[in-house]
C-alpha cells in the first residue's frame, strides 16, 4: 500500500528539483543566486551578485604572489571565485565555504579548476575545514556574509575563527551593506582599512582587517 505522506514528500522533492533545474536552464547563475536568496535570506547579503567594480576594489590589496590559500565565505554562484582563480598562482588553493548546499553543488559542477575546493559547511568551522585539506593557516579570507542579520553569536564566532586561521600579515576582506560590520572586526583586528564602493547594487562598505 502506498504511503500518502511519503508519496507527498516524494512529489514535493521532485517538484523542487524541477524548479531548480528550470531556473538553472532559464536564468543560469543569476537564477540560482535568486533562489538561494529566497531560501536563505539571512545568509545571503543581496539578491544581486557583486559588480565587477566592487570585485576589483575588494581584491586590490591582495599580494597574489605570496598567496597559497585563499578562503571565501558565502561564495554563492562564484561571482568572486572566478576572479580570484584568475589572479591566483598555479600552486595556490581557493576554498569556498557555504551553508547552502545548492550553491555548493552548483559550484562543484560549474568550476572545473584543480585549485578550487567547494565545501558545504559553516564559516565558523574554517579552522577544521582548512586542516582537513592540508592547511594550517590562510593568507586571505573573503566574506560577503551579512553579519548584522546572522543568528545571534554567529558573527562574533566567525570573526574570531577567521582571526585565528589567518597567518600574520594576512587579511580578512569583508564587503557589507551596513557599516556596523566593522564592529565585528574591531574586536580582533587592530588595523582595519575601509572604503565605500558606489558602483554596486546596493552600494556597500569595504573593510580589510589585517592580522599583526
Where do the PLM segments sit?
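A short glycine-rich, Lys/Arg-flanked "PGG" loop and its adjoining helix->strand segment in the class I
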Residues: 156-168
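Conserved class I S-adenosyl-L-methionine
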Residues: 67-76
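Conserved SAM-binding motif I beta-strand of class I
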Residues: 93-98
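S-adenosyl-L-methionine
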Residues: 104-132
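Core SAM-dependent methyltransferase catalytic element
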Residues: 197-212
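Class I SAM-dependent methyltransferase Rossmann-like catalytic core
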Residues: 26-28, 32-65
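Conserved SAM-binding loop of SAM-dependent methyltransferases across substrates and taxa
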Residues: 77-90
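Conserved beta-strand signature within the Rossmann-like core of class I S-adenosyl-L-methionine
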Residues: 169-176
